[in-house]
């Protein structure tokens, strides 16, 4: 997704366990200046990947998810200020490219209107299932954006608000009470003003 530049020697992500630096072979140019600079002699380019066996009591299988490329009619890939949820997550992250401070991609201004469109690529004839995470993700990100931009109009458009886990309905009510507007319905079309990029 190229949502942030990673250094050749970096920590994989802010919450990595163990919290250690590693060499990203995709970024490293193998100049070996890091070997000379490291006073602890901790860098060894002769190491090769190895398999390590662990005895554990529990295995957690986290399958993750794939990025769905949104439909063209919503302007993704056409309008600069249309991004998807994974990009917003990266932008909002304190260790992301904007260090958690959001601005419009087109002109770096503060956003005044923010709209979340739910169920893009799911709950339709091709993919009738619900992803199970998007509603809560939009509520969380909507609340974060409302904290940073209290004057912004934030709207979440949804088919059904899926808040079916413990505490989710209360979270939904708190989001509504923080002046996030909820509209039940599908968005028909997104257009852009060519001058303002709104």
Regions from the language model: what does each represent?
Residues 1-37, 41-53, 63-165:
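Rossmann-like dinucleotide/flavin-binding elements
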Residues 158-179:
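Amphipathic alpha-helical
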Residues 162-164, 188-191:
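Short acidic loop-to-helix transition motifs that present clustered carboxylates
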Residues 41-46, 54, 175-188:
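A conserved beta-strand/loop element that lines the FAD pocket in flavoprotein oxidoreductases
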Residues 65-66, 187-189:
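Short, polar loop motifs at secondary-structure junctions
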Residues 193-198:
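Short, intrinsically disordered, charge-balanced linker/junction segments flanking boundaries
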Residues 57:
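Receiver (REC) domain switch/active-site residues of two-component response regulators
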């Amino acid at each position: 997704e190229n949502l942030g530049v990673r250094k050749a020697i970096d920590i994989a992500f802010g919450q990595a366990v163990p919290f250690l630096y590693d060499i990203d072979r995709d970024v490293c140019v193998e100049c070996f200046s890091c070997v000379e600079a490291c006073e602890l002699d901790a860098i060894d380019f002769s190491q090769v990947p190895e398999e390590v066996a662990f005895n554990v009591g529990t295995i957690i299988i986290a399958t993750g998810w794939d990025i769905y490329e949104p439909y063209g009619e919503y302007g993704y890939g056409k309008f600069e200020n249309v991004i998807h949820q994974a990009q917003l997550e990266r932008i909002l992250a304190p260790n992301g490219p904007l260090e958690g401070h959001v601005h419009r991609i087109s002109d770096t201004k503060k956003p005044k209107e923010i709209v979340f469109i739910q169920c893009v690529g799911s709950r339709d004839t091709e993919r009738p299932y619900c992803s199970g995470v998007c509603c809560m993700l939009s509520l969380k990100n909507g609340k974060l954006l409302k904290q940073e931009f209290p004057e912004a109009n934030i709207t979440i458009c949804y088919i059904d608000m899926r808040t079916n886990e413990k505490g989710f309905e209360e979270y939904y009510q708190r989001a509504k009470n923080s002046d996030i507007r909820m509209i039940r319905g599908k968005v028909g079309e997104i257009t852009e003003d060519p001058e303002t990029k709104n």
